[in-house]
Amino acid sequence: LKAIFNAVGRYCPSLAVSVSLLLTVAPSTAVAAATSYPLTLKNCGQEVTFKAAPTRTASIGQSTTEILYLLGLADKVVGTAVWIGPVIEGYEDVNAKVPRLADNDPSFESVVATKPDLVTAQFQWHVGPEGIVATPKQFAELSIPVYVSPADCAAKDNSAGGDGVRHKSFSMELIYQEISELSEIFDVQDRGEALIAKLKAREEAARGKIANADGKLSAVFWFSSAEMDIDPYVAGTNGAPGYILSALGIKNVVSTEEEWPTIGWETIAKADPKIVVIGKMDRRRFPADDWELKMKFLKSDPVTSLMPAVKADHIVVMDAQAMNPTIRTIEGIEVLADAVEKAGLAK
C-alpha cells in the first residue's frame, strides 16, 4: 500500500490523462456573447470597471495565474508572484517566460513597475483592506483595477489577516465564478465555459470511482506546521479539503469550521483517521513544508507512529495547491479517489 499511496501524490497515469485533457481548452460549440465594454463587476464588495480587455496583468497568486494560462492569456501576464509549487503540467515553458516578481510576497513597487492595467490576486491577505502588498485603494489611485478571487472573500472574513475565517463551506462554484468572470473581463467566454465544463466532468468521474465508500472512511489533511514538534495545521470543514472529502463521501475527523486550525496529534490519533493526507509544496517557510519531513515525523513520533493509518501506510502525498481553494482542488479529488480505489478501501 505504501507504493500505491505515496506514488499517487507524485504521479498517477489516470490523473496525467485527465490533466492532459484540460491543457488545451477548445471552444465550446455554442458561441458565448461577446463582452460589452465598459464592463462593471462587483468583486469582493467593490465595483470594478474595465474600459477594454486588459493587456498587461500582474497576477499575485499561483491559482489565478494558472487560470489565466488555461484561458490562453499567458501573453497578457506581465508578472506573477506567490507560488508554492510547480506550475500546472504542460505550462512549464509558458510560465518560464513570465517574469517572477517574487516566489512569496511581492512589493507594491515591483507590481506597479510592470505597468499593469489589471492586478489579480488569489488572496485578500495580499491585496485587500489589510493587504500586505497593497490595498485596492492604493491601486485605484493609480487607475489600476483589482480583481480578487471570489473564493477568498465570499462568506469569509479576512479582517484579522492570516487565513481569515470562512463562514460558509468552500465550493468549486466559487472557482467557476472566477473563471467565468475572468473570461468575461478578457472577452474569452467560450474558453471559460469549456474549461468549467472539463473541470466539472473530471470531478464527476472522480466521484464515481469510489461511490461505494460513502460514509465508510475518515481522513485528516496535514498542510504544514510552524515547527515539527508543535501542533500541526490541519484542515477544518470549511476549506478546500472539506470540499474534497465531502465530494468523495469521506468523513473529516476535524469538526471545527476553521479553515486551518492547529490541533494536537494526541487528539487526532484518538479520532483514528483511516487516511492521512500530507501537503507537498516547494515553499519552505516552515520545516514541515517539506513533505518528506512530514512522512519521517509520522513514522517516528511516539504518538503518530502508532496510528493505524500510519502503520498501514495509508498516507497520501497531495499537491498543497489542491488543499487551497484553487483549480487544483479538482486534482485533489482525483488523487484521493485514485488512492482509495487502488488500495481497495472503497469496497
Regions found by a protein language model. Give the residues of each.
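Bacterial Sec-exported substrate-binding components of ABC uptake systems
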Residues: K2-I4, Y11-P13, P27-E66, K168, ...
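Short helix-initiation/N-cap motifs at beta->coil->alpha
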Residues: L41-G45, V98-E109, D152, E257-W265
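A short, structured surface patch at a secondary-structure boundary
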Residues: A58-T114, L118-P129, I250
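Solvent-exposed loop/turn segments at secondary-structure junctions
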Residues: S63-I67, W83-P86, L118-V119, Q124-P129, ...
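Alpha-helical, coiled-coil/dimerization segments enriched in small aliphatic residues
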Residues: G85-V87, P232-W260
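Extracytoplasmic ligand-binding site segments that recognize negatively charged/polar headgroups
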Residues: P86, H126-A134, I144-E181, D214-A240
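Short helices/loops that flank or line small-molecule/ion binding pockets
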Residues: F108-K115, V133, I263-D272
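Structured C-terminal subdomain patch of bacterial secreted/periplasmic proteins
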Residues: S169-E178, I278-K347
